Amino acid sequence: MKTAHEVRPGNVIMLDGNPWVVLKTETSRSGRNAAVVKLKLKNVLLDSTTETSFKGEDKLDVIVLDRLDCTYSYFADPMYVFMDEEFNQYDVEAENLGDAAAYITDGMEDVCQVTFYEEKAISVELPIIVTREVTYTEPSARGDTSGKVMKPATIAGGSTLSVADFVKTGDMIEIDTRTNEFKKRV
């Protein structure tokens, strides 16, 4: 148990029987009144966000979620199956993947972190940088070289993002999975 004052972003707290990740904390103190802590929270199971306030001395139940390094194995509609080093398989529902689903492809060797709550896989966190092949992009426009020229490209897995003008179909590129931005050609 921690007081609301001691809770930091990244902590997972239990409220009304649901686990919530603390995204942001803001403490305000005014004159004679007790400190008030405002928390921005994200529900681990439902992927919804909310803001709530607590008195600084309110006790909150902080929990620790299990994380395990796994690799993607296969897709069994509607579940994505991941495997750890000991060949244990874990099913993650497609809706729990969120934006990560765009980067999951057959044969990928990236190590992902699977998060568990009560022994159930609830989310997958990809590495920050992934390398994917450009499956389609328009040819470069000649003479358009002023500034940072970007064009749309489709990568393996089907998602579309903006890439530099010099990238061609078949090139391997690095992508930042947090921002969905092109980093460089490999």
UniProtKB/Swiss-Prot annotation:
Where it sits in the cell: the answer is: Cytoplasm
Task performed by this protein: Involved in peptide bond synthesis. Stimulates efficient translation and peptide-bond synthesis on native or reconstituted 70S ribosomes in vitro. Probably functions indirectly by altering the affinity of the ribosome for aminoacyl-tRNA, thus increasing their reactivity as acceptors for peptidyl transferase.
Q: Name one Pfam family in it.
A: EFP
Source organism superkingdom: Bacteria
Write out the entry's keywords from A to Z. Cytoplasm, Elongation factor, Protein biosynthesis
Q: Which family does it belong to?
A: Belongs to the elongation factor P family.
| Pathway note | Protein biosynthesis; polypeptide chain elongation
Name of the protein this chain belongs to:
Elongation factor P
One Gene Ontology cellular component annotation? Answer: cytoplasm
Name the encoding gene, please: efp
Q: Name one GO biological process term.
A: peptide biosynthetic process
Cell membrane among the record's keywords? no
What molecular function does GO assign, one term?
translation elongation factor activity
List the HAMAP family.
EF_P
**Does the keyword Cytoplasm feature in the UniProt annotation?**
yes
